[in-house]
C-alpha cells in the first residue's frame, strides 16, 4: 500500500504540470511486485507520457531502458542488438559522475548519442555541490560537508556530496567547460586542410545556423594570427553543410598552424550577449613544407 499511495499522490499532485514529461517510479529501490503494480496503475491513468524505473532494467515495468553508469561498449551492444531486437530507448538516469577531476570520457558517450538513434543520452550526476561555506578560526573560508557537522566520528560519506558541475554558490568547476564543449549544438569537421574546407553539422532542433556568426582564425605556432575572418552559414536544423574558407599560405617562419572556429549569436537573447561563445573547434593544419629554421645570431 505504501508504494501505491506514494505513486498515486505523486501523479495527482503533478499530472497537470507542463514540466513533467516522464514519470519515475523511484530510485535505487530494487524491483519487484510493488513496482510492477505501481507501473500497471500508472499505465491505466497515463496515456501520453512514458514511465521509467531504472531498477526494472529490461523487465516489462519500464518504458525506457535507463540503467545508470553504463560503459560506451554496453551502449553500443544494446543499440546493435538484433535477437531480440530492442525497442525501448536507452537513456541513462545517471552517468558521468561529476566529482573531482571528471568528465574526461564525455566525447566518447556523445559520439554514441549522436550516431545511434535508440541511445538517446543521459543525466549527469549532478549539477551542484551540496556543501556549505564556513569560516575557520583564522578568518579563512572553506567548504564543509558530511562529517564536519554533528558529533565526532559521526557516520558520513565524506565529500561524496560534492560532485557537481558547479560549486555550492554556482561557480563553475573546470569540467563544466568540458560538458559545454561536448554538448555544443554546432560541430565542425575539417575535411580538406589545403583549402580549409569544413563540414558543419547543425544539431539545433529549431534554429538555423544563420542565427550565429562563425569567426575563424589561422594561428601560427608563434601565436600570431596569419589569417582570419567571419562567415554567416545557412544550415537548417539537423542539416550538414560544406563551407570552404580558402587556402592560406603560411609564412616560412611558421612550422605548423591551427584553425580556430568560434560561434557567437547575431542577436542578444536572455542570458546570452552577442559576444558569448556558444561553440568552438580547433584543428591542427598540415605542416609547412616551406618552413625554414630561423637563423641564430650570436652576439
Predicted feature descriptions by range:
Residues 1-199, 203-210, 215-225:
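Extended substrate-binding grooves/exosites of carbohydrate-active enzymes
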Residues 213-257, 263-264, 271:
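Intrinsically disordered, low-complexity Pro/Gly/Ser/Thr-rich segments with frequent PxxP/GP/PP motifs
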